[in-house]
Amino acid sequence: MTPRRRRLGLLLAALICVGIATTLVLNAFRSNLVFFFSPSQVAAHEAPVARSFRLGGLVAPGSIRREGDGMTIRFIVTDTARQVLVVYRGLLPDLFREGKGVVARGKLEADGTFVASEVLAKHDENYMPPEAADALKQAEQVNRRMAGTPQGARQ
């Protein structure tokens, strides 16, 4: 084998190794990423079914229901435009309240119910995850347009 062919073979082997390593790294990232979706995005079928993601919004007033076992809680998360039913089995954070911000991590069932494995409540009256704040602003703009209220007008 000539030196030129040997260099070409080594270069080809190195490129194959880099390609395999890149594929493995990207696959690992894809399986560990947890995306954020608002109730409006879930209603628009933008959220994956049976794959973990975060759902954020406000706990709808009057929506918290405890099951007979005392550990299963059902509540509705809203972004003021759409609502998603959430089912969670476990202890809720102390700051979990109706009308307050919440981020739930879990999976969407085929029937549209979000089964949460973790529920996080906002930690003070001013904090809201940026994604949830953006989703609420977008939903508010949609509500204004649907109601015919000018965007700059106050209600």
Curated annotation (Swiss-Prot):
Keyword Protease found: no
Residues holding heme: 123, 127
A Gene Ontology molecular-function term? metal ion binding
- Please tell me whether the keyword Cell membrane is annotated for this protein: yes
Topology, Cytoplasmic side: 1-7
The record's GO CC annotations read: plasma membrane
Membrane-spanning segments = 8-28
Q: How does it sit in the membrane?
A: Single-pass type II membrane protein
Q: Which family does the entry's similarity section mention?
A: Belongs to the CcmE/CycJ family.
Pfam families for the chain:
CcmE
Which SUPFAM superfamilies has this protein been placed in?
Answer: Heme chaperone CcmE (SSF82093)
Q: Give the protein name, as stated in the record.
A: Cytochrome c-type biogenesis protein CcmE
Sorted alphabetically, the Gene Ontology BP terms of this entry are: cytochrome complex assembly
Instruction: Identify the species of origin.
Output: Cupriavidus necator (strain ATCC 17699 / DSM 428 / KCTC 22496 / NCIMB 10442 / H16 / Stanier 337) (Ralstonia eutropha)
Q: Which UniProt keywords apply?
A: Cell inner membrane, Cell membrane, Cytochrome c-type biogenesis, Heme, Iron, Membrane, Metal-binding, Plasmid, Signal-anchor, Transmembrane, Transmembrane helix
Q: Where in the cell is it found?
A: Cell inner membrane
Periplasmic membrane side: 29-155
The entry's function note states:
Heme chaperone required for the biogenesis of c-type cytochromes. Transiently binds heme delivered by CcmC and transfers the heme to apo-cytochromes in a process facilitated by CcmF and CcmH.
Under InterPro entries, the record lists: CcmE (IPR004329), CcmE-like_sf (IPR036127), NA-bd_OB-fold (IPR012340)
